[in-house]
Amino acid sequence: QFLDMIFDVCKNIAMPLHIYDRNSHRMSHFFEFRFPKNAGLHMHNQLPYTETGTVYKRYAVSLNVNSITNSETMCSRRLLEILACGGILVTNNSPVVERQFRNFCHVVQDASQAQEVLARLAAGPGPEDKERAAAGAVYVRSHHTWQHRLEQLADTVNF
């Protein structure tokens, strides 16, 4: 539902959406998620993981959708990657976003919020948006690297 709402808002404000489909290489899309054909989406094939940072930096705004929205700890890897790259991020809310990332991204919950934020960002991010993104990059690099997770895992299992 959130993704459909974002597609509608972007279409209404004529904000182009570029989607890099991680499932584009699959032979059968019968059971796979299909993007709507009438949403004005610019579809791209999947990328090698090593190119994702370059792609995130190419766009003024990146969208994230957390499919798990009730977890205290789970968020998409994409959220961390976009923030780590210094990207301006628009995302849906979840407990972990609220607790750890709210200050570094634009959290939208409904169509009116999404329209307001995305229309403003489409016109060009302002200094506050850029400062928020830069702070997000510092925060992720300081608290959410693989090294941090491995240390946390080692501590948890008394390794």
Regions picked out by a protein language model, each given a short descriptive name:
Residues 4-7, 53, 108, 125, ...:
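Residues lining hydrophobic/aromatic ligand-binding pockets adjacent to catalytic sites
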Residues 77, 109, 144:
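Residue-level signal for the nucleotide or nucleotide-sugar donor/cofactor binding architecture
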Residues 123-157:
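A charged, aromatic-enriched C-terminal amphipathic alpha-helix characteristic of glycosyltransferases
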Residues 55, 117-120, 156:
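CheY-like receiver
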Residues 1-103:
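Nucleotide-sugar donor-binding catalytic core of glycosyltransferases
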Residues 49, 94, 111-115, 126, ...:
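Residues at or immediately preceding the N-termini of alpha-helices
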